């Protein structure tokens, strides 16, 4: 589990372990947290250290890789694209090199809906044109385009999961979202209602019903289940694939804020800001492929359930203690 100490990676580790897999976490802890590994074998290392990766692969007799490592802030990618190409492209090439040298043939890759850019239609299918609006999406698409060459040359099987808006927390309260600083909408709103700075809403003049961006929010537990199903398909001899992982339903930023108002019993203080460069007005998934091929379903991904699980997690205070462990 490369990057297995982060938000999505840690939930996927939990799902894999519950499905009977042995898990090894490899993370540099630049944004991940040691507490989130929940007792799994855990190695501190960088994805660009191909030699160290090979040693770990051999020591633990690794049979498959899930790759969550990398940078993911849209706004930061606009101001610092070098870092994004280095982490997301060069880092992944280093990982692939180690896999090829050791003979590991299966990988599940953490991609993003940002590879699509401005939608021509909605919900978007996997064959929608890819025209990223920012370096984050471009860096993910660049490495996606490399995978078929590695598959043909080295016999690898690599499936890409294009996430939409991962959100929520483990329903049993074992894990949740803990970024430092926090940039995602729902936990940022929780910070705002808990006395932090107001929530910034970037743009209220989009061509949407209430002027704010529309997003497809998928519960992180459903997202973790998608990884387990895709891995099982590859290990059973199935073909590589590209899969959208979302619900097919969009909520606006204002709708999310209003739901948070209701669930927390507090009003989220907001500040309206100009649009951010690289933000499309709407991103909604058509996830028919993963549902039909693998039997996946977003069973936890209703907005109320997402926010309730995330709010319970926020109230534990774990995210505060974890902030000091993120470096």
Where do the model's predicted regions map?
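N-terminal Rossmann-like NAD(P)+-binding domain of SDR-like oxidoreductases, especially those catalyzing
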Residues: 1-169
């Amino acid at each position: 589990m490369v990057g297995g100490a982060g938000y999505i990676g840690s939930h996927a580790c939990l799902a894999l372990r519950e499905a009977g897999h042995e898990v090894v976490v490899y993370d540099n802890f630049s944004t991940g947290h040691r507490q989130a590994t929940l007792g799994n074998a855990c190695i501190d290392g960088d994805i660009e250290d191909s030699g160290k990766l090979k040693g770990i692969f051999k020591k633990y007799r690794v049979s498959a890789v899930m790759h969550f490592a990398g940078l993911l802030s849209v706004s930061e990618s606009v101001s610092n694209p070098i870092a994004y190409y280095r982490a997301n492209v060069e880092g992944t090439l280093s990982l692939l090199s180690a896999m090829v040298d050791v003979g590991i043939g299966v990988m599940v890759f953490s991609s993003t809906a940002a590879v699509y850019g401005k939608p021509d239609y909605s919900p978007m299918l996997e064959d929608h044109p890819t025209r990223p609006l920012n370096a984050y999406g471009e860096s993910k698409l660049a490495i996606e385009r490399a995978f078929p060459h590695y598959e043909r040359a080295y016999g690898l099987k690599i499936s890409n999961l294009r996430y939409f808006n991962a959100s929520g927390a483990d329903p049993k309260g074992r894990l949740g979202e803990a970024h430092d600083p926090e940039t995602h909408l729902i936990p940022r709103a929780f910070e705002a209602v808990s006395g932090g700075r107001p929530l910034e809403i970037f743009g209220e003049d989009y061509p949407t019903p209430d002027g704010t961006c529309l997003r497809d929010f998928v519960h992180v537990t459903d997202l973790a289940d998608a990884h387990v199903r895709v891995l099982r398909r590859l290990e059973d001899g199935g073909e590589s694939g590209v899969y959208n992982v979302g619900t097919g339903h969009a909520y606006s930023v204002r709708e999310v804020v209003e739901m948070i108002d209701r669930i927390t019993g507090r009003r989220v203080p907001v500040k309206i800001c100009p649009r951010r460069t690289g933000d499309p007005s709407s991103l909604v998934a058509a996830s028919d492929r993963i549902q039909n091929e693998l039997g996946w379903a977003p069973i936890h991904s209703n907005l109320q359930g997402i926010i309730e699980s995330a709010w319970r997690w926020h109230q534990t205070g774990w995210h505060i203690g974890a902030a000091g462990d993120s470096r």
